[in-house]
Amino acid sequence: MKFFVRVLPYAALVVLAGCETVQTTDAGAVGVTREQRVTTMVSSQEIEQQAAKEYAQLMSEAQKKGLLNRDPQQVARVRTITQRLVPQVAVFRKDALQWKWESNVLTSKDINAWCMPGGKMAVYTGLIER
């Protein structure tokens, strides 16, 4: 117990030292100034690489199950919409324009869509059909 009490303050300092405040949007870009505390222990590049790897794995699994991009018209519609949205990200994060944006449609009754770091997106058919 004594060891824990002595080590805890140092561990807390290490964690706090790895944090910084960042703006997630350009100040006042949409009438909002949003700050978040994030850790710098993992670089943005590492996060984006891991997200790309995870996204590729998810899409591969969906393809094996026959759930990936089954309806060419839906895929075309989603990609047209996302291609129109991507240029707008500069309002929030200028660096996001450089991401390798990708969007796919997953067959699911769920009403959902998501985006991973680095611009990896998925839209569920439930969102389109309902």
Regions found by a protein language model. Name each.
Residues 21-130:
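Peri-catalytic and regulatory segments of divalent metal-dependent proteins
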Residues 15-18:
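C-terminal motif of bacterial Sec signal peptides marking the signal peptidase cleavage site
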Residues 1-11:
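Bacterial N-terminal signal peptides that target proteins for export
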